């Protein structure tokens, strides 16, 4: 399996075979579970510290992550966060950008007391096409006759859960938001001969993966 071999090679290349402990961010999803499974194959006798984050008033899947941790014999930790906004200023001061996803902050804070090396499954959706609900909506909003701008607008409309509805109130009048600039950034990914769905994969990879996750994990 090419994907399995590639991930295992990446794990073995990045990690020291003499590592006494390795950490992993473990959700209940396929991506982090796959990384953990292959990590255990590469390091069958190494102590693995797995960490899951549980935010109050959001869907709790930590019971599933606990079962996964038991299957792959990890030392599992569950972080329960009641007020996730409490340390927002500290989190933003680290990455210098207003990221809304704060699970990484609490993961790193916990991991630094466990090990200096940790892995996650972040980026799997962008690499392997995990946002099926978005793809379905995009294909419903577009067709083979849709022009570049129409496809870009449809693509953005598939990300409504990521929008900040009151951004002017939050960022103030000095924040000059311009839709045309957004369209220009995305234009290369939708103005080409690829199929509509492949264009979405291209935009996902060059957008969130390269300009969100990569800078984030480089900062921490």
Predicted features along the sequence, with ranges:
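ATP-dependent adenylate-handling active sites, centered on carboxylate activation for C-N bond formation
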Residues: 1-200, 216-220
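Short Ser/Thr-interspersed hydrophobic loop/turn segments at strand-loop and sheet-helix junctions
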Residues: 205-219
């Amino acid at each position: 399996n090419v994907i399995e071999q590639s991930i295992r090679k990446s794990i073995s290349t990045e990690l020291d075979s003499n590592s006494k402990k390795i950490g992993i961010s473990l959700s209940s999803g396929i991506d982090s579970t796959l990384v953990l499974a292959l990590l255990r194959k590469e390091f069958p006798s190494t102590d693995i510290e797995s960490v899951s984050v549980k935010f109050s008033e959001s869907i709790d899947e930590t019971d599933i992550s606990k079962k996964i941790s038991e299957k792959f014999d990890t030392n599992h930790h569950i972080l329960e966060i009641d007020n996730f906004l409490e340390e927002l200023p500290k989190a933003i001061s680290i990455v210098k950008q207003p990221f809304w996803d704060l699970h990484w902050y609490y993961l790193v804070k916990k991991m630094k007391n466990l090990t200096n090396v940790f892995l996650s499954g972040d980026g799997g959706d962008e690499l392997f096409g995990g946002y099926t609900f978005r793809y379905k909506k995009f294909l419903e909003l577009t067709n083979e006759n849709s022009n570049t701008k129409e496809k870009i607008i449809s693509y953005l409309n598939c990300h409504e859960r990521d929008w900040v509805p009151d951004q002017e109130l939050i960022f103030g009048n000095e924040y000059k938001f311009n839709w045309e600039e957004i369209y220009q950034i995305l234009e290369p990914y939708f103005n080409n001969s690829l199929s509509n769905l492949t264009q979405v994969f291209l935009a996902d990879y060059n957008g969130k993966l390269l300009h969100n996750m990569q800078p984030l994990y480089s900062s921490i």
